[in-house]
Design a protein with these regions (language model features):
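Short hydrophobic/aromatic patch on the recognition helix
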Residues: 44-54
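Solvent-exposed, charged amphipathic helical/linker segments at domain boundaries
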Residues: 116-131
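C-terminal peripheral helix-coil segments that are non-catalytic and often amphipathic
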Residues: 140-233
Length: 233
C-alpha cells in the first residue's frame, strides 16, 4: 500500500480549501468576487503565501472550472446509469434533464463555466483540445450516448451534401466526435442538439425567459420531446 507523504497530504488539503473558498465567493458574488487576497484572509494566510499553491488568479479559476466540469459530468453520468444500458435514447434524455437540474441549482457555477468570458475561464477553455480536458470529459458522455442512438436507429439527418456545402470548411467531424467516426451530418445533428439544449438552459439560468413563461420546465420538456422525436423518426 502506498502512503502519501504528510507534506503532500497537507498541500492537497490546502489546495482543496482554497478552491472551496473560491467557490463560496463565486456563489456569493459572482466571478468578480473571487480574490486571492480574500481567500488568503479567510484562511489566515498572507496574500503572497497563497501563490505557493496557485501562481495566479486565472490558474485558480481554471482549476475550479475543472472541478465543476467533473462534478457536472458525474451528475449527468449518474442519471445515465440509472437507465437500462440498452436504451440509449432514454439515457440521453435523462442526461439532458440532469444537465438542466444541476445548472438551475448552481447558477453561479454555470455562469462561470458557460457564461460571460472570464480570463481564467477563457484561457482554460482555449486548452480544451483533447479528451483529457475536463470540458471534453464532460461532453464525452453526451457524445457517446448520441452516437449510440445513431448506431441504433439511424435517425434522419439533413443531406450530407447540404452540410458539406454550408459547413464543410468550418467543421472537423473527427475532432468534434473525438474519433468516434461519426459522419459530418451526424456531427451537425449533435451540435444542433447541444446548442438547442444549452441555449434553453442558459436562458433559464440567466433569467431571460420570465417575459414568456412563468415556469420553464414544461417548455424544456416540450423542446426535449421534440428533439427526441427527431431521433425517433
Amino acid at each position: 500500500m502506498t502512503i502519501t507523504p504528510r507534506r503532500e497530504r497537507i498541500r492537497s488539503a490546502t489546495v482543496a480549501e482554497i478552491k472551496n473558498l473560491a467557490r463560496q465567493l463565486l456563489v456569493a458574488g459572482g466571478p468578480p468576487a473571487i480574490s486571492l487576497r480574500a481567500i488568503a484572509r479567510d484562511m489566515g494566510m498572507t496574500a503572497p503565501a497563497i501563490y505557493r499553491y496557485f501562481p495566479s488568479l486565472d490558474a485558480l479559476v481554471g482549476d475550479l472550472c475543472e472541478d465543476l466540469f467533473d462534478e457536472l459530468r458525474e451528475w449527468v453520468e449518474a442519471a445515465r446509469d440509472a437507465c437500462p444500458a440498452d436504451e440509449p435514447l432514454p439515457r440521453l434524455t435523462e442526461m439532458a434533464r440532469a444537465f438542466r437540474r444541476w445548472s438551475v441549482a448552481h447558477p453561479a457555477e454555470f455562469g462561470l463555466m458557460f457564461g460571460s468570458p472570464v480570463p481564467g475561464v477563457t484561457r482554460y477553455e482555449a486548452d480544451c483540445v483533447g479528451p483529457d480536458h475536463a470540458g471534453a470529459r464532460f461532453g464525452a458522455p453526451f457524445l457517446q450516448a448520441f452516437a449510440e442512438v445513431w448506431h441504433t436507429s439511424r435517425f434522419p439527418t439533413p443531406p450530407v451534401e447540404l452540410i458539406e456545402q454550408k459547413l464543410g470548411r468550418y467543421i472537423a467531424p473527427h475532432e468534434v466526435s473525438h474519433g468516434a467516426g461519426l459522419p459530418v451530418e451526424v456531427v451537425y445533428a449533435y451540435l444542433s442538439g447541444w446548442t438547442r439544449l444549452y441555449g434553453l438552459v442558459a436562458m433559464e439560468v440567466f433569467g431571460h425567459l420570465g417575459w414568456a413563461v412563468t415556469e420553464v420546465e414544461p417548455l424544456f420538456e416540450l423542446e426535449l420531446a421534440a428533439f427526441v422525436a427527431q431521433m425517433s423518426a
